């Protein structure tokens, strides 16, 4: 029965739920479990337009700033995204989630505050008055109906499930209670008929009792109303001739009426069952021997039971029953009150005792049990109770489920341009809400506050404001408040410590058991060689993965796509690199890997690679077994000096013999033989010698690989096979067969091409036979002997370093003389690889190490010669102390060459002008010790080859040891050596090694136009060092000498096409205070050529004079604002795109003495004489005093010199000043004479000092910003014409004594 009721209840509740589910079937199932979500976009345009829109579009404001104050009174996060352009306006996106009734309560307002802050406040409808800018949310009607239907569906389903669970639990509890009651039932003793009659309790309603009886009951009830019963009918039990124990009666009442006996009725149905059982007892006799009285009483009792309203005592029929024993009635009344108290232990708070008739029921347990067995059903719950429970539970479930918790959450997303949010902006969020700055690429220093509610105080969140450097592990806000910091202090978990550089990051200081590092991840700051800059806000993560058992170090400071390198078949490495904006994410990934201080520790973490205790660790043949892990090692290594064979079956010396395991039989025509050769120093180790052999009746050819028949005979004069290869180092034009280094312009030591003499190859004028394939073209005699002499130029070695410049003599001068006789043009028509080069290439087939190919290039060079010129060459360099000496000697040489005799001394050495060369004339002056040969003139000569007899211009007599054959003068055409290789893989690897050797010093790979350096090619500063940075040589200008306040510096701009990109030059200027110790400097200034000089920022003290273009590579720089007679030191560095600096180049020079106008000084000396001559008035004295005081020390020296030179007979200048002006004024004037150095004082005593002015062109540039990484040096001259104008500067010079120019 119970199961049937549960099934009916389940069907009752499931039916409406199914109907609702069907009705709501059109609703999106994904939305059934979500709250209502509404998105609103709010633009800040109205307020920016009305107040200060100009901050967004002002051309003068490149990065406008705006203070924001954003406050959210609802729970929800705040997101800032700077994804807009600078011309776009900021806007807010509100994502409101909640139920239908709460969403319209969300309001917002924007306000422009007086301090220029844009306020955006999200608040409740009742939380703030209606202000301009407030906008409520609106809910469409169709969405509301759909929402109500969905909520009703969820409510019915939830209520049904809760009700079924509750009923199931209740039935189980009652079933357990019933079993407990059966075990506790006590059997009733057998009683007599009188005792059985005594158990019949006669119920007399109180309405049948007289007034006095009712009054006594009222008094008793008033005294103990707190313990009276609450039933609807009052009664007075009367015992019929038997003193029944009220205690036993109460126990029976408890078991029958409260617990229900065997019926195990629920608490809800207990009252109905008690009424049913007690009504059956109402038909019993009320008094002994009076059946009519019983019937009368029962009729009246039933009428009272059926009545629907309380019975008034004034309308009842009063029939009293007399009692003879008042004491007995009193006792029964007291007991009745006790029974009522037991039935209602909580008491009755009502005081209406008279108008509400009450009745207490006492039931016989034994009769109740009988009734239960006969008339009561077995089901624990009847139909009426089941219906009541079902309806009540369904109603409660509907009411409770209709109020599903759906909190109101408002998420704010602020979209702004980059750098718009100014430092000091405020964000006020509800406690528990966060500020999401993950998409805020350029965050500002903002102030964050949290509040418990919209009216609560604000608390500053010191940890949440760490936007620029968020803590990796933990943040302690209390530390920040205690130490008055702007943000909370970062803490680390156990086992970690703070990074010494990045205080907000944590590094591990305790490492557990190493589980292997693969993938092995490292991170550090790198250098972006693609963009040509060093990122300051990025950390590069480099992840190395295991290839086939071995890890190789790669470059870790470059930014390129993942590259895969194959060093040998058993060792590969692939690196995947990711650029991370956030260092914390890099650190978190790194924490999962292991830490290694060195490569050896990394390799040792894998444990022994082999067990070498038995069978040589499994290594074959002459391999050595090692247990320690090493780079490029699988545990089997070759002995020192040996290399693994192609099939890795053994080790051999690749420089000797062949490799029989290369898949081509070692290049042998018939047999490839192997022989074991033990090492003399260690007999346990041996080398595998492999060589070619021939079968019977065949012999090995001269090439060591081919085989020839032994019985084969060559006809007379015939050609039997290939002729023997002849070494070409002793052959005419033999350099054509050797390698060539096109950087050093030198011939390599290794012979690349094979030279044979099978053909009769002879050239005109040469008696020796030439190698095959060599074409020789002779040059006519009239074009063979040519003389060249250069213009005299300042010695470049004198202009750099410590320059001992003298304004008296000027620059020393250098002149070059050369005679060249080109006799033959040589061209190589056919090229055959020599045996030595072939063996070297064959030994490298399949090799993957770049170092092996670089060693081959060092031996054989990186190019081979195709065309060259041969002949004779003699050159001489002549140094002069100054330009005047060179000019005088050259004029004398021209007179002698024309037949003129300037002196007797020169007539003795006069020769035929056709054969007299300028070096011979200089040498004759030096040998004779003539006086015209000035001190400091010297000459050095050298020659290549022996001068032919047909050339009369040779100066140096060749020694007998000099060969008579022509020598190599110049290589006119050369080709890369890798073009001679036929194996595609070897050719590719050799080409990569050639490029690496030419541009990356052999320690890096060429990637387009830059070098990717190996891990070993980085300096202590972390910068790559594989690509050599050319050193610019700083020198004084060869055209413009230094003046008293100006110096012109110049250097050659040199930038290789691959590996190095020069982006700037740095010039440091220092003033030396100690002439003996140049390390003591007073001031120091560092200038950038790009940022300070060509931009015009340092004009007029630093200006460009000449910049590179497509024809010229010289850079000239004018340094002004210098002090006369002062030593300055200038240092130059070249800077490339990785931040490297070249080796410095210095120039130390002393500026000349102050320039003086000697003509003006002589005029002033005449004027002073006229003022001092005769009577000198006060006005004349003052005029003389003012004139002399304003001259300055250099001019005053020349005035003194000219005055004493012409007017000393009238009195010396010093004495005349003291006599005419007085000691005090004369002392002030004459004290200026001591301001100059002794060197300048001596120069100012020269009889003749002339003033000349030179013109110096320079570029007057307007200030402009030039990006160094976009600088094109070849187009720099054209680009500067847009912002610079060519102007002329007049520079004064003094010539002491005779003029320098003749």
Curated annotation (Swiss-Prot):
Pfam families: Annexin_2 (PF18411), ASTN1_2_fn3 (PF19743), ASTN_1_2_N (PF19441). Detected in brain (at protein level). Expressed specifically in the brain. Expressed in the cerebellum, hippocampus, cerebrum and olfactory bulb. Residues 175-388 are cytoplasmic. Residues 459-507, 608-652, 656-708 form the EGF-like domain. The modification Omega-N-methylarginine is found at residue 337. InterPro entries: Annexin-like, ASTN1_2_Fn3, ASTN_1_2_N, Astrotactin, EGF-like_dom, FN3_sf, MACPF. Residues 22-153, 410-1302 are extracellular. GO terms for biological process: cell migration; cell-cell adhesion; locomotory behavior; neuron cell-cell adhesion; neuron migration. Disruption phenotype: Slower than normal migration of granule cells in the developing cerebellum, leading to a decreased cerebellum size in adult mice and impaired skills in tasks that require coordinated movement and balance. Granule cells from mutant mice have a rounded shape and lack the elongated shape seen in wild-type. At 6 days after birth, increased granule cell apoptosis is observed, contrary to the situation in wild-type. Disulfide bonds join 463-475, 471-490, 492-506, 612-625, 619-636, 638-651, 660-672, 668-692, 694-707, 785-951, 876-941, 947-954, 1000-1011, 1013-1026, 1101-1121, 1153-1240, 1261-1284. One of its GO terms (cellular component) is endosome. Residues 1030-1145 form the Fibronectin type-III domain. Residues 340-381 are annotated as: Disordered. Residues 1-21 form the signal peptide. The chain crosses the membrane at residues 154-174, 389-409. The modification Phosphoserine is found at residue 227. It is a multi-pass membrane protein. Neuronal adhesion molecule that is required for normal migration of young postmitotic neuroblasts along glial fibers, especially in the cerebellum. Required for normal rate of migration of granule cells during brain development and for normal cerebellum development. Interacts with ASTN2; the interaction is not calcium-dependent. This is Astrotactin-1. It comes from Mus musculus. The gene is Astn1.
């Amino acid at each position: 029965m119970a199961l049937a009721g549960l099934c009916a209840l389940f069907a009752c509740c499931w039916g409406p739920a199914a109907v609702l589910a069907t009705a709501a079937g059109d609703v999106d199932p994904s939305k059934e479990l979500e709250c209502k979500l509404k998105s609103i976009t709010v633009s800040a345009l109205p307020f920016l337009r009305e107040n200060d829109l100009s901050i967004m579009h002002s051309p003068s404001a490149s990065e406008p700033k705006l203070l924001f104050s954003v406050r959210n009174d609802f729970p929800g996060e705040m997101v800032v995204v700077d994804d807009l352009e600078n011309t776009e306006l900021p806007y807010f996106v509100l994502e409101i989630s909640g139920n239908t009734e709460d969403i319209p309560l969300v309001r917002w307002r924007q306000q422009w505050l007086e301090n220029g802050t844009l306020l955006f406040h999200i608040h409740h409808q009742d939380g703030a008055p209606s202000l301009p800018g407030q906008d409520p949310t609106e809910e469409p009607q169709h969405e509301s109906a759909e929402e109500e239907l969905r909520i009703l569906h969820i409510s019915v389903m939830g209520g049904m499930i809760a009700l079924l669970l509750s009923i199931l639990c209740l039935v189980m509890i009652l079933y357990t209670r019933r079993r407990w009651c059966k075990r506790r039932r006590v059997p009733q003793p057998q009683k007599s008929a009188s005792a059985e009659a005594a158990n019949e309790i006669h119920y007399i309603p109180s309405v049948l009792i007289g007034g006095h009886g009712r009054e006594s009951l009222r008094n008793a009830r008033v005294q103990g109303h707190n313990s009276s019963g609450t039933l609807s009918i009052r009664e007075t039990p009367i015992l019929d001739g038997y003193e029944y124990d009220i205690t036993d009666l109460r126990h029976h009442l408890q078991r029958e009426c409260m617990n229900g006996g065997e019926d195990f009725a629920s608490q809800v149905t207990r009252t109905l069952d008690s009424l049913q059982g007690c009504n059956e007892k109402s038909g019993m006799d009320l008094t002994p021997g009076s059946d009519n009285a019983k019937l009368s009483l029962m009729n009246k009792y039933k009428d009272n039971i059926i009545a629907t309203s309380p019975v008034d005592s004034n309308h009842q029929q009063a029939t009293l029953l007399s009692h003879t024993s008042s004491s007995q009635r009193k006792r029964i009344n007291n007991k009745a009150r006790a029974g009522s108290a037991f039935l209602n232990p909580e008491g009755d708070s009502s005081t209406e005792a008279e108008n509400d008739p009450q009745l207490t029921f006492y039931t016989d347990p034994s009769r109740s049990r009988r009734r239960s067995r006969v008339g009561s059903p077995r089901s624990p719950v009847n139909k009426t109770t089941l219906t009541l429970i079902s309806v009540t539970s369904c109603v409660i479930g509907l009411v409770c489920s209709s109020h599903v918790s759906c909190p109101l959450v408002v998420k704010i997303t602020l979209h702004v341009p980059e750098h718009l949010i100014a430092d000091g902006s405020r964000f006020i969020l509800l406690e528990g809400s966060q500020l999401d700055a993950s998409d805020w690429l350029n965050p500002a220093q903002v102030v964050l506050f949290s509040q418990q509610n919209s009216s609560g105080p604000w608390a500053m969140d010191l940890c949440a404001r760490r936007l620029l450097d968020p803590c990796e592990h933990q943040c302690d806000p209390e530390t920040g408040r205690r130490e008055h910091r702007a943000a909370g202090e970062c803490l680390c978990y156990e086992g970690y410590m703070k990074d010494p550089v990045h205080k907000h990051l944590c590094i591990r200081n305790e490492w557990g058991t190493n589980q292997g590092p693969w993938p092995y991840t490292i991170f550090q700051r790198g250098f972006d060689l693609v963009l040509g800059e060093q990122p300051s806000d990025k950390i590069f993560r480099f992840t190395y993965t295991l290839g086939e058992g071995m890890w190789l170090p790669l470059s870790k400071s470059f930014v390129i796509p993942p590259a895969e390198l194959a060093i040998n078949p058993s060792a590969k490495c692939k690196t995947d690199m990711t650029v991370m904006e956030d260092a914390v994410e890099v650190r978190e990934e790194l924490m999962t890997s292991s830490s290694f201080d060195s490569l050896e520790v990394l390799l040792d973490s894998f444990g022994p690679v082999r067990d070498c205790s038995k069978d040589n660790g499994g290594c074959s043949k002459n391999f050595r077994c090692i247990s320690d892990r090493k780079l490029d090692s699988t545990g089997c290594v070759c002995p020192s000096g040996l290399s693994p064979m192609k099939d890795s079956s053994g080790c051999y010396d690749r420089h000797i013999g062949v490799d029989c395991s290369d898949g081509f039989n070692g290049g042998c025509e018939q047999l490839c033989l192997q022989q074991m050769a033990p090492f003399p120093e260690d007999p346990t180790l041996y080398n595998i010698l492999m060589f070619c052999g021939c079968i019977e009746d065949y012999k090995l050819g001269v090439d060591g690989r081919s085989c020839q028949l032994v019985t084969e005979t060559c006809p007379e004069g015939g050609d039997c096979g290939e002729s023997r290869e002849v070494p070409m180092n002793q052959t005419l034009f033999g350099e054509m067969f050797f390698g060539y280094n096109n950087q050093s312009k030198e011939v390599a030591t290794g012979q690349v091409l094979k030279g044979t003499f099978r053909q009769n190859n002879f050239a005109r004028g040469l008696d020796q036979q030439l190698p095959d394939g060599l074409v020789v073209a002779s040059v006519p005699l009239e074009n063979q002997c040519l003389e060249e002499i250069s213009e005299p130029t300042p010695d470049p070695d004198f202009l750099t370093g410590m320059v001992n410049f003298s304004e008296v003599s000027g620059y020393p001068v250098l002149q070059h003389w050369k005679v060249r006789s080109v006799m033959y043009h040589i061209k190589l028509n056919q090229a055959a690889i020599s045996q030595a080069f072939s063996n070297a290439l064959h030994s490298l087939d399949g090799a993957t190490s770049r170092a092996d190919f670089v060693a081959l290039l060092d031996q054989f060079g990186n190019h081979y010669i195709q065309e060259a010129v041969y002949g004779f060459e003699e050159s001489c360099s002549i140094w002069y102390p100054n330009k005047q000496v060179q000019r005088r000697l050259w004029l004398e040489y021209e007179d002698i060459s024309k037949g003129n005799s300037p002196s007797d001394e020169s007539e003795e050495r006069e020769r035929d002008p056709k054969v007299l060369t300028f070096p011979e004339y200089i040498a004759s002056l030096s040998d004779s010790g003539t006086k015209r040969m000035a001190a400091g003139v010297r000459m050095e000569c050298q020659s290549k080859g022996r001068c032919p007899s047909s050339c009369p211009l040779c100066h140096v007599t060749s020694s007998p040891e000099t060969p008579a054959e022509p020598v190599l003068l110049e290589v006119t055409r050369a080709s890369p050596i890798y073009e001679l290789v036929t194996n595609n893989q070897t050719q590719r690897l050799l080409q990569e090694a050639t490029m690496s050797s030419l541009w990356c010093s052999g320690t890096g790979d060429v990637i387009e136009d830059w070098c990717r350096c190996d891990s070993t090619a980085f300096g202590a500063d972390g910068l790559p060092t594989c690509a050599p940075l050319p050193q610019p040589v700083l020198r004084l200008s060869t055209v413009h000498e230094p003046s008293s306040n100006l110096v012109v510096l110049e250097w050659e701009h040199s930038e290789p096409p691959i590996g190095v990109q020069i982006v700037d030059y740095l010039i440091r200027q220092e003033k030396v205070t100690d002439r003996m110790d140049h390390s003591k400097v007073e001031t120091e200034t560092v200038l950038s050529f790009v940022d300070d000089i060509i931009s015009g920022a340092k004009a007029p003290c630093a200006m460009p004079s000449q910049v590179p273009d497509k024809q010229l590579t010289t850079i000239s720089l004018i340094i002004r604002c210098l002090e006369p007679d002062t030593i300055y030191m200038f240092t130059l560095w070249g800077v490339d795109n990785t931040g490297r600096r070249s080796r410095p180049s210095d120039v130390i020079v002393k500026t000349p003495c102050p320039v003086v106008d000697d003509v003006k000084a002589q005029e002033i000396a005449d004027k002073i004489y006229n003022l001092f001559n005769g009577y000198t008035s006060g006005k004349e004295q003052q005029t003389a005093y003012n004139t002399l005081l304003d001259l300055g020390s250099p001019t005053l020296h020349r005035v003194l010199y000219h005055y004493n030179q012409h007017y000393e007979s009238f009195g010396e200048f010093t004495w005349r000043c003291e006599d005419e002006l007085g000691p005090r004024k004369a002392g002030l004037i004459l004290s200026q004479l001591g301001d100059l150095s002794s060197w300048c004082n001596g120069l100012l005593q020269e009889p003749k000092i002339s003033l000349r002015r030179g013109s110096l062109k320079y570029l007057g540039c307007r200030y402009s910003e030039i990006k160094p990484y976009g600088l094109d040096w070849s187009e720099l001259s054209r680009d500067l014409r847009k912002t610079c104008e060519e102007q002329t500067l007049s520079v004064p010079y003094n010539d002491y004594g005779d003029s320098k120019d003749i």
